């Protein structure tokens, strides 16, 4: 297993995948860095990358009708950005580095192609993406309830 495969399998999102599946994804993956203030994703952009955060923090932000930017969630090491790539829809939030960020960037088209070619890989990844989506929606719901008490 090469270095990039080791880094992939060490991330919680892929921790339980079979080594052969991780090796299968290495060709879709590269290491990336962002400086504080850099956008990983902008509202309205196509989500063409799945980011696995290794170090640093990312603010998930939205704009109110007034133009005010509100941080709705912060993510850090072990978290994932780009979970809606399966929906093939534009991003509805901004994702901005709060500090220096080190991440793995997985090309969405390559990932989706590999998921289709290898269903024993595709289903576990789709399930992980759905789990992350559910977790985020649950946290957003709790935040919303807390605001209106």
Sequence positions of predicted segments:
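Cytosolic regulatory regions built on CNB/CRP/Popeye-like sensor folds
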Residues: 1-149
């Amino acid at each position: 297993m090469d270095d990039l495969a080791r880094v992939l399998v060490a991330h919680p999102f892929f921790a339980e995948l079979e080594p052969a599946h991780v090796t299968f994804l290495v060709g879709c993956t590269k290491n990336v860095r962002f400086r504080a203030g850099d956008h990983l994703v902008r509202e309205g952009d196509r989500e063409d990358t799945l980011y696995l955060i290794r170090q640093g923090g990312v603010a998930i932000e939205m704009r109110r009708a007034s133009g005010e930017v509100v941080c709705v969630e912060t993510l850090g090491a072990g978290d994932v950005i780009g979970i809606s790539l399966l929906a093939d829809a534009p991003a509805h939030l901004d994702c901005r580095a709060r500090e220096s960020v080190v991440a793995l960037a997985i090309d969405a088209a390559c990932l989706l192609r590999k998921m289709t070619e290898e269903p024993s890989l595709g289903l576990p990844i789709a399930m992980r993406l759905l789990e992350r989506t559910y977790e985020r929606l649950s946290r957003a719901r709790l935040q919303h309830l807390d605001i209106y008490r």
